[in-house]
Curated annotation (Swiss-Prot):
Belongs to the ClpS family. Gene3D superfamilies: 3.30.1390.10. Disulfide bonds: none annotated. HAMAP family: ClpS. This is ATP-dependent Clp protease adapter protein ClpS. It comes from Corynebacterium aurimucosum (strain ATCC 700975 / DSM 44827 / CIP 107346 / CN-1). Binds to the N-terminal domain of the chaperone ClpA. Involved in the modulation of the specificity of the ClpAP-mediated ATP-dependent protein degradation. One of its GO terms (biological process) is proteolysis. Pfam families: ClpS. NCBIfam families: PRK00033.1-1.
Length: 111
């Protein structure tokens, strides 16, 4: 129920009669850009051999041969693959290492 108050201009304003009180705070977990992981993306290029890309994934990122080949095939067939993810500093370091090895690597935030 609302109380009505008439102003000097004849306008009726309403306001709540009682304000409900919250006994406990409600916490909402909102996904913000600060807590989303970063991803290292390797892009297909016309320069590097498939065997070399697989080799780089093994030596630079530490993947076994099977996983390195799966990621290399994803790059080859889909044009790109997310090859690592995590905190920004770690992914940034992975991107730099892959670029030094001659691969086309970028980073982006998940989401």
């Amino acid at each position: 129920m609302k109380a009505h108050k008439e102003t000097s201009a004849g306008v009726v304003m309403s306001s709540p009669m009682a304000t409900p009180e919250l006994d406990e705070a409600i916490e909402v977990d909102v996904a913000t850009s600060e807590n989303l992981p970063w991803m290292c993306i390797v892009w297909d290029d016309p320069v590097n051999l498939m065997s070399y890309v697989s080799y780089v994934f093994q030596t630079v990122l530490g993947y076994d041969k099977k996983r390195a080949n799966e990621l290399m095939m994803q790059v080859h067939t889909e044009g790109k693959a997310a090859v690592s993810s995590g905190e920004r500093d770690k992914v940034e370091a992975d991107v730099k290492k892959l670029q030094v090895a001659g691969l086309w690597a970028t980073m982006q935030q998940a989401g």
